[in-house]
Regions:
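NAD(P)+-binding Rossmann beta1-loop-alpha1 motif at the extreme N-terminus of oxidoreductases
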Residues: 1-51, 121-122, 350
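Anion (oxyanion) recognition and catalysis
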Residues: 21-22, 106, 271, 322
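Residue-level detector of anion-binding/catalytic polar loops
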Residues: 26, 111, 276
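Conserved N-terminal Rossmann-fold NAD(P) cofactor-binding segment
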Residues: 28-82, 102
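Rossmann-fold NAD(P) dinucleotide-binding segment
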Residues: 75-120
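Rossmann-fold dinucleotide-binding core
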Residues: 79, 114-230, 234-235
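Well-ordered, non-membrane alpha-helical segments in soluble/globular domains
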Residues: 95-101, 191-201, 261-263
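NAD(P)-dependent Rossmann-like dehydrogenase/reductase catalytic/cofactor-binding core
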Residues: 166-182, 200-236, 243-350
Length: 350
C-alpha cells in the first residue's frame, strides 16, 4: 500500500524522503520558502555510494516512483498524512510556524517517527522509570512536546551521516556514512506494522541489481535507538573545543582510552535505564566507523559558526545520569564547555 509521509526538515530529511520515494511512497517535506521553491522546481539530489562502487550515485527525485514535494510549515496539514517524521534539529522546533505545526500534529493523533539526535520528551516518557518532566531543561523549547501522546512517538536513531556540500544548492545531500536507521516500535501494533511495511518496501529496492544502502530497521526494544548516545558523547560533542572544532575521527582516536571509557559509561547508563547489552553498538565497531569521519560534527560546526543554541544531548545524558546517581568527569567537562561557548556567543550576539 502506498503511504503518504510528512517529514519536518528537508536537509537530513531528504535522505529518508529519497529512500521512501524509491520504495514507491509519496513524501512532503517542510522547510523554508526558498528551499521549498527550489525543491519543487529542481527536485532533490541525494548522493549515495553503492557497495563496491568507487563514486557516489545521484538519486534524483524526478526519477523515483514515489513523489517528493516540499512546502512551508504553515501550509502542512498533518491530517492528510499516514505518518509524520521529525528530521530537524531540536532548537528549530521553537520557530513560531513550526511550533504551530507541532500543535496540529499532536492534535491529529498521527504516529510520529523522530530521526533527531535529541529524543523527544514524549518518547522519553515511554521509558519506565524516567520522569520526563525532570529533563525539560535540556530542551530549548520543551513546550512544543506537551500535546503529544507518548505512545504515538517513536525514535529512529539517525546513524547515517550526511551533509549538504557547501558548494551545492540546498536540494543536494551527500551521504558520507550509509548506515541504517534503527527505529523503536510504537505502542500501537498497527502503527508498528505500518513502519515495518515501510522498512520492508525500502529493503527490496534494487538499482541495477544492487542493494541501496541506508535501510530502515524496526526493533522491539525502546532502547535500540539510544545506542546513539554513546556515539554522540564520545565523538560528536567532543568535536567541540575551546577553539576550532576537531573531526569526529580526532575526537574519538585522539585519546582512545578516554573515548572507550566515556562510551562504556554511557552504555552503562542506558543499561541501568533498562537497555539490554545487545541493544548497544560495540565500541570497536563505532571506532572503526569514526576513523572515516573526517569532518567535525554538526554541533561543533554550528558553534564554530556562531550558533547560540544547539541540540543538547550532552545535557540530557548528564541529567538522566544524575537521576540514576551517576556522573562522569568528561561528560561534565563537555557540558560545561558547551554551556560556556553558547553563553559567550549569546553575549556577543546581544
Amino acid at each position: 500500500m502506498k503511504r503518504n509521509i510528512l517529514i519536518l526538515g528537508a536537509s537530513y530529511g531528504s535522505l529518508l524522503a529519497t529512500k521512501l520515494a524509491m520504495a514507491g511512497h509519496d513524501v512532503t517535506m517542510t522547510c523554508r520558502s526558498a528551499t521549498s521553491n527550489l525543491i519543487n522546481d529542481k527536485g532533490t539530489d541525494v548522493r549515495i555510494k553503492l557497495r563496491d562502487e568507487d563514486s557516489h550515485r545521484a538519486f534524483l527525485s524526478a526519477d523515483l516512483p514515489g513523489k517528493i514535494h516540499a512546502t512551508t510549515p504553515d501550509k502542512a496539514d498533518p491530517a492528510a498524512f499516514d505518518m509524520i517524521a521529525l528530521a530537524m534539529q531540536e532548537p528549530q522546533y521553537r520557530a513560531p510556524e513550526v511550533a504551530a505545526l507541532m500543535r496540529r500534529i499532536a492534535a491529529s493523533g498521527k504516529p510520529c517517527l523522530s530521526i533527531m539526535n535529541m529524543p523527544p520528551l514524549p518518547f522519553l516518557a515511554r521509558i519506565p522509570g524516567v520522569n520526563a518532566s525532570e529533563l525539560r531543561s535540556a530542551f530549548s523549547c520543551p513546550e512544543v512536546w506537551d500535546g503529544f501522546e507518548p505512545g504515538l512517538m517513536s525514535l529512529c536513531s539517525p546513524d547515517p551521516q550526511a551533509f549538504r556540500p557547501p558548494e551545492e544548492e540546498a536540494n543536494v545531500l551527500h551521504v558520507g556514512l550509509p548506515t541504517n536507521f534503527k527505529a523503536a516500535e510504537f505502542a500501537d501494533l498497527a502503527h508498528t506494522e505500518m513502519l515495518q511495511q515501510l522498512a520492508d518496501d525500502i529493503e527490496v529496492v534494487r538499482v541495477d541489481g544492487k542493494e541501496v544502502p541506508v535501510k530502515l530497521r524496526v526493533h522491539d526494544s525502546l532502547f535500540t535507538p539510544l545506542a546513539k548516545w554513546s556515539m554522540l558523547l564520545t565523538g560528536n560533542y567532543r568535536c567541540i573545543t575551546a577553539g576550532e572544532p576537531q573531526s569526529i575521527r580526532d575526537a574519538v582516536h585522539g585519546d582512545a582510552e578516554l573515548s572507550l571509557n566515556v562510551y562504556a559509561w554511557v552504555d552503562s547508563l542506558a543499561q541501568k535505564l533498562g537497555a539490554a547489552p545487545q541493544d548497544q553498538v560495540p565500541f570497536e565497531k563505532y571506532a572503526r566507523a569514526a576513523s572515516s569521519l573526517l569532518k567535525p560534527s554538526s554541533a561543533a560546526r554550528a558553534i564554530a559558526a556562531g550558533a547560540t543554541n544547539i541540540e543538547r544531548v550532552d545535557r540530557l545524558v548528564q541529567a538522566l545520569a544524575a537521576s540514576q546517581g551517576m556522573c562522569h568527569p568528561e561528560v561534565d567537562r563537555i557540558v560545561d564547555l558547551v554551556d560556556h561557548r553558547l553563553s559567550t556567543q549569546v553575549t556577543q550576539a546581544a
